[in-house]
């Protein structure tokens, strides 16, 4: 009987302390959304596959070209 009473008291104590900690932790996790959107221009020029092929062929490269991270590369 004595052990059951001690277990009941300890469970009640743990329940109360966990509820108190839960209320404190939810207040600190409120995140507010920023209203400003930041857009950055990519450092390298964009490349569209069909435009790259067409530009290279119009310059005289009969095999066209391909897109790389640095832009369009024409094939001989």
Swiss-Prot record:
Signal sequence, start to end: 1-19
Gene Ontology process terms (BP): defense response
Keyword Signal among UniProt keywords: yes
Upregulating conditions: Induced by lipopolysaccharides (LSP). Induced by A.niger alpha-1,3-glucan.
Alphabetical UniProt keywords: Antimicrobial, Defensin, Signal
Chain's role: Has antifungal activity against the entomopathogenic fungus M.nisopliae, but does not display any antifungal activity against S.cerevisiae nor any antimicrobial activity against M.luteus, B.subtilis, and E.coli.
UniProt record similarity statement: Belongs to the invertebrate defensin family.
Protein name, as recorded: Gallerimycin
Native species: Galleria mellonella
